[in-house]
């Protein structure tokens, strides 16, 4: 494992304590101002859910030397039976759509300079075929941003350790993105841990 993914201050602290030499990534739908400075002590990568959170906390994270990401919403649902957890469902506030990003950049042209990576998390106990569909949607909506990024996080929900999981499809997705855009690829294989 290259590191941990946390959802807030206390998980990030635990990740730093238990795996001190590994990367510590944090995503939170909304960071709290009263905790953010402490979070900077533990996190290496900080992923924001929205352009407004990026604008509010991104400069402090960048000044602290953190790698900064934005959770994107490719608006491509692959869910069946897990719709309640689907971040791509209509009305979802998880991740930033392309239209939201474009509107935010028009109002705040300094935002793109803060970003080092993009993060999507759209799967729930799914096979690599769903990842391939989602990745195609990510490229359709966000491909022009990827060459400027250092990394792309494919998120969690990959059922990698399930018998029959299409590892060749996963490998193909990773290699394709690395070759096209020159980015490091992250996965969050939660059930494998």
Where are these regions (language model features)?
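Active-site-proximal beta-alpha core segment in soluble small-molecule metabolic enzymes
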Residues: 1-151, 173-176, 180-181
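Short acidic/glycine-rich loop or secondary-structure boundary segments that cap or lie
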Residues: 79, 162-163, 193
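Glycine-rich beta-strand-to-loop/alpha-helix junction loops that act as flexible
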Residues: 122-123, 151-161, 189-191
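Metal-dependent catalytic neighborhoods of phosphoester/phosphodiester hydrolases
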Residues: 163-169
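Charged (often Lys/Glu-rich) extended helix/loop segments that serve as interaction or gating elements
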Residues: 173, 184-193
């Amino acid at each position: 494992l290259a590191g941990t993914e946390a959802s807030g201050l206390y998980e990030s602290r635990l990740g730093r304590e238990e795996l001190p030499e590994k990367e510590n990534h944090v995503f939170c739908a909304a960071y709290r101002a009263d905790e953010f400075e402490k979070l900077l002590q533990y996190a290496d990568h900080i992923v924001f859910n929205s352009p407004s959170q990026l604008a509010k906390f991104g400069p402090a994270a960048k000044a602290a030397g953190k790698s900064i990401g934005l959770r994107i919403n490719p608006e491509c649902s692959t869910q069946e039976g897990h719709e309640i957890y689907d971040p791509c469902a209509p009305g979802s506030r998880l991740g930033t759509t392309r239209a939201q990003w474009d509107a935010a950049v028009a109002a705040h042209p300094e935002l793109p300079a803060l970003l080092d990576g993009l993060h999507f998390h759209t799967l729930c106990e799914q096979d690599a075929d769903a990842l391939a569909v989602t990745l195609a949607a990510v490229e359709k909506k966000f491909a022009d941003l990827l060459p400027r990024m250092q990394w792309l996080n494919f998120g969690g929900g990959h059922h990698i350790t399930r018998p029959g999981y299409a590892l060749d499809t996963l490998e193909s997705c990773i290699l394709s993105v690395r070759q096209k855009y020159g980015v490091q690829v992250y996965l969050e294989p939660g059930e494998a841990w």
